[in-house]
Amino acid sequence: ESWINRLSPYQGGGSMIKNVETDSSTYLDGFHKFEAGTPPIAQVVGFSSCIDFINEVGINNIYSFENELTQYAYEQLSKFNDIKIYDDFKNQTSIISFNLNGIHFNDLAMLLDKKNIAIRTGHHCAQPFMKHFNITGNARMSFGVYNTKDDIDYFIKSLNEVKKILK
């Protein structure tokens, strides 16, 4: 308890402040001064539904379905002759990292976004991985139990359309 009283808050926000003035703030006592912002109430309530869903569907069924989607996406992407896929499907599920030759990953993401497709781009906090492949970043697609093969087909169709624009 003595340490809690000696430590200063590392961030600010609602629910942790006794009083705010133009030149100072007074914080709540004890651990309360470290509880900035609104607690994640909706996330806690939603987590229960997530557990129910996983128990109903079965974690192994979810894994198998995601693995099937990943294999399908990998097969479709492998048909491109101007793509570099950085993942080994045998050791990966749900995420595929790639680059298209001659197309910057951020440009790709911006145009796919216009087609309501969200991908991640950049170094993904994995700079050693990027250095290993001598790249600054890549595009990363991922999917889960809520995706379908139709989603992947739409992605592939959109990827072809975007390539025509950017090349």
Where are these regions (language model features)?
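Pyridoxal 5′-phosphate
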Residues: 1-167
